[in-house]
Amino acid sequence: MAFSTEDQIKAMGFCHVGENCLLSNKASYYNCKNIKIGNNVRIDDFCVLSAGIGGIEIGNYIHIAVYSSLIGAGKIVLKDFCNISSKVAIYSSNDDYSGQFMTNPTVPSRYTNVTSSDVIIGKHVIIGSGSVILPGVTLEIGVAVGALSLVNKNCSEFGIYIGTPVKRIKERGKNLLELEENLKGSN
């Protein structure tokens, strides 16, 4: 995997990029002025980050794996220590599927009914491969989402969720909070 140089990253015009960031030069970044990236972030090949007016905020110690996408007009926030597995799609905007309106971004907005709502991915959240996160969803601290899940509702802290749509199946361990403190103490 080849990563962009510091000069290449600066030329893209991000709102902010922290230290020790590895941004694939095979990923696509749109509206970089609305994208903030913290420290110790890795974004892999073939990811798409398309920031709308709400922007995208990526915290510290975050990995976004291959073929994942963060797209929409609403704000998308990834808090510290998130792991977004491959082929995850996070949407902050949605077309109207009722048939009462036309769809897709090539159609003038007066004929469409796009809705947008913020998506908040809490600290220490892990989202499994192939999952879809819909607009307006908040995943609280420590949530784990199993592979191939559809997240259409908020998920409570330290829950493990799976399915289409997701349902909570059990409690997730909290040892990672102690490990976070150890990591912070070692820096």
Residue ranges, per PLM feature:
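Membrane-proximal basic amphipathic "stem/tether" segments
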Residues: 1-11, 24, 184-187
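Flexible, glycine/small-residue-enriched loop-and-beta-strand segment within the central core
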Residues: 3-6, 25-37, 42-133, 164, ...
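Beta-rich strand-turn-strand
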Residues: 119-120, 129-143, 149-152
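Flexible glycine-rich beta->alpha loop in the catalytic core of nucleotide-sugar glycosyltransferases
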Residues: 88, 95-96, 138, 149-150, ...
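Conserved G/P- and acidic residue-centered "switch" motifs that form tight phosphate/ATP-binding loops
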Residues: 145, 163
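Conserved beta-strand-loop-alpha-helix hinge in the C-terminal portion
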Residues: 157-159, 165-180
